Amino acid sequence: MTQSLSGTAAGCDTCGFKLGEPIAKLEVSDLCFVSDHRFPGRCVVTLHQHATELFELSPSVRRAFADDVSRAARAVKLAVNSFKMNYEILGNAEPHVHCHLIPRQLDEPKPKVPAWLHPEAQAALAAGKAEEIKQRIVTLLGQASAA
């Protein structure tokens, strides 16, 4: 199931965690878009329920979260034609289960450097480009759930 959430304010009712603009409601999480010119298509998959660790989740929710991450990653990768998707599950700064999806491109200044060590400062994408990418991601998610 995928439901578009563009423009909707979402966040954890317990801790208030929210990162990015929610663009789709997945089975147990929201897909949020982060406008980042260094990594066009960057998103965060944020678990609906509050938890700080994957092992705190029931097996069914943990599997569903992994499926949400996988579905979202596929849509993002296809939307921006990246050669590799980086998955980051951290949590020391924001103690709420979430996974960063960072599409990597071969023509980046330093494609083999971890995203957090990128030499350029983050800046937003041009509004039109961001909207185009978000729409492609949501469309691809819809196609995946119809298959």
Which functions belong to the PLM regions below?
Residues 1-147:
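HIT superfamily nucleotide-processing domains
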